[in-house]
A protein has these predicted regions:
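Catalytic or ion-translocation cores adjacent to nucleophile or general acid/base/metal-coordination motifs
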Residues: 142-150
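Structural signal for conserved beta-strand scaffold positions within catalytic alpha/beta enzyme cores
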Residues: 82-85, 145, 176-178, 285
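Generic hydrophobic alpha-helical segments
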Residues: 16, 100-108, 129, 201, ...
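A generic, well-ordered mixed alpha/beta core segment in the N-terminal half of proteins
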Residues: 117, 126, 165-166
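Conserved phosphate- and dinucleotide-binding cores of soluble alpha/beta proteins
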Residues: 4-11, 15-17, 22-29, 35, ...
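HTH-adjacent hinge/linker in prokaryotic transcriptional regulators
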Residues: 4, 46-117, 131-139, 152-155
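Glycine-rich beta-strand-to-loop/alpha-helix junction loops that act as flexible
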Residues: 121-125, 312
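Key DNA-contacting residues within the recognition helix of helix-turn-helix
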Residues: 42-44
Length: 322
């Protein structure tokens, strides 16, 4: 007996594949049209894949982005890396940030539940990310600022504004530090930490399940608004340079190895401690711009991310760095 007697019709395989992939018909509709069961339709479609009658192609740059993300995940031991494609139509100076922010918003809403406590940091990428949250997907989670306010930046980018907007978009309760993030002395920080509102929030930090932050770059060139907007004095900045600063996250400054810079800014800052931050189960970093590559690498070496969301140009630069 010829073995071919057990083979399905090639025509039927092609027809089922055509109806399914080209015409978008359901397996039930195809079964009715071809006079076979849904199970047979499923097998015909599988045969079309096995015999390479149908071929799946992921177009560039999407395939390259997927492969780059996989490499970054392996190199830095990340739970997930998402590389956002930059749309080529209607390009603007914020296209990279917006692409990263949109992916960040969708990722956050994919994982957040009403049992979560979400810590939020300041920044322009965070501004767009929260802007893109879908208010139809309300979670009733808890939202908390990861640090104090920054008087020298745009009101819309401040952590207090962003945390309030996130709570309004997704539903839930917000907890905020209402004082400035950088204070004049360590004594003022100690006094604030004794106040009930501040003490309650600092205690809440140990219960945060998800954090959402960007990073700022201070190497090879300082582009972070914490430097360019006079957040700190020139003397403070020079101390950071002498401490080999590479970047900032949640008002904390870190070096090439992701360790916090040892200057008096550390004790004058009202923000979650880096050690406490690193214990958060899901740390999401959303970063855009190739100028942040060195700072981002330092943050990843310092284990500051579980999930990384970046634009395709920054991803390519990160892969090229040793």
């Amino acid at each position: 007996m010829y073995k071919e007697v057990y083979f399905p019709s090639n025509w039927m395989i092609c027809k089922a594949a055509y109806l399914f992939f080209y015409e978008g018909k359901s397996q039930k509709e195809i079964g009715s049209e071809l006079g076979v069961s849904n199970v047979t339709v499923s097998r015909l479609i599988q045969k079309a894949k096995e015999q390479k009658i149908v071929k799946f192609v992921i177009q560039e740059p999407y395939l390259l982005n997927l492969e780059t993300a996989k490499k970054i995940e392996a190199r830095y031991h990340l739970r997930e890396c998402i590389v956002a494609a930059i749309p080529q139509d209607n390009l603007s100076e914020n296209s990279e940030k917006e692409a990263v922010a949109l992916e960040g918003a969708r990722y956050l809403q994919r994982i957040i539940t009403e049992r979560d406590i979400l810590g939020i940091a300041w920044g322009k990428t965070m501004y767009y990310l929260i802007k893109y949250l879908n208010p139809c997907q309300r979670t009733n989670a808890v939202f908390v600022t990861l640090h104090g306010s920054i008087a020298t930046v745009d009101f819309d980018l401040d952590v207090l504004t962003l945390t309030t907007k996130a709570a309004m978009s997704l539903g839930g309760q917000r907890y905020c530090l209402f004082s400035n993030g950088l204070l004049d002395s360590t004594e003022n920080v100690k006094m604030l930490k004794k106040e009930k509102n501040t003490a309650d929030i600092l205690e809440l930090y140990s219960k945060i399940t998800i954090s959402l932050s960007g990073i700022g770059a201070l190497y090879p060139k300082a582009t972070t608004p914490l430097v360019t907007s006079n957040y700190m004095s020139q003397q403070d900045y020079e101390k950071l340079v002498n401490a080999n600063v590479y970047g900032d996250i949640m008002l904390r400054f870190f070096d090439e190895n992701g360790n916090e810079c040892d200057t008096d800014l550390r004790d004058r800052t009202l923000s979650i401690e880096l050690d406490a931050y690193k214990k958060i189960p899901t740390k999401i970093l959303a970063v855009s711009g190739v100028h942040k590559a060195a700072a981002l690498k330092a943050a990843l070496v310092g284990k500051m991310a579980d999930v990384l969301i970046i634009d395709e140009k920054l991803a390519a630069e990160l892969i090229m760095m040793k």
